[in-house]
Amino acid sequence: MLSLRYSLPYLLLQTRESSTKLFTKKPNNVVVCAARGPRPRSPRVWKTRKRIGTISKAAKMIACIKGLSNVKEEVYGALDSFIAWELEFPLVIVKKALVILEDEKEWKKIIQVTKWMLSKGQGRTMGTYFSLLNALAEDNRLDEAEELWNKLFMEHLEGTPRKFFNKMISIYYKRDMHQKLFEVFADMEELGVKPNVAIVSMVGKVFVKLEMKDKYEKLMKKYPPPQWEFRYIKGRRVKVKAKQLNELSEGEGGLSSDEDKIDNEIESEEEDGEDLSEEEEDEKELLGGSQGQITSREPSLDHLDSS
């Protein structure tokens, strides 16, 4: 007679083993959809209004004051109405508007917008004061420029940036105000602010013009022209041969666009100094290659101010 008493436990063991295998397997057996990436989402219907960027807002701000006269109350009223519905003061928009006005050389509007911003207690930075100083100089408002310079110099005596000294020296150099130029240069030396090549060349030209050869020689001996300088080429700091700058760069508070007289003098001097022979140029290239320095192919910085 056939006995089946061991068949049932055997089946139970089989089912238990299979069930444990099913539940103990790793989750890598989960079926992955063929279309990878984030699932598609429907557009959000509650964002129906397009957002206006800061550049377009700056353009609107310029448009609202462009057709107005230079009356202070009229311009200030238009600017107040423009920011009436803003929860916070739109400092970024005003800064971008000032950059656009500076590109368009609207010096009167720059002065008005900057003074309006400062009256609100906003944007009190050295960059704002420098743009105001530059606009006052371009608009031939020398008294206000000197007043602003004296105020900043007295408040930030040792912390005055070098570009402010450079700007004031360039202003006095253009207008042949030699005594005030010497005063600013003396303040630089007293505070230990090292002048750049452009400042040294401008002060040296004034010494030569006034026939002060002894002071010119002392100046050139104290501040000799540098042989090397550092530049950033494609994000890397590279040591290159220094180019003798005869005018200030815009980043250092250089000469303004209206200073054509200085530009013409410097260009004529550069043309006279470009009479080097080919042998001397070859020797310079060989010397530069033997020292293993990287030369720059950037254009000369002497013509940045005229742009």
Curated annotation (Swiss-Prot):
Residues 248-307 are annotated as: Disordered. It comes from Arabidopsis thaliana (Mouse-ear cress). Belongs to the PPR family. P subfamily. Residues 238-292 form a coiled coil. PPR repeats lie at residues 125-159, 161-195. The keyword Repeat applies. PANTHER family: OS01G0757700 PROTEIN. This is Pentatricopeptide repeat-containing protein At4g21190. Gene3D superfamilies: Tetratricopeptide repeat domain. Pfam families: PPR. It comes from the Eukaryota. Keywords: Coiled coil, Repeat. Residues 260-284 have a biased composition (Acidic residues).
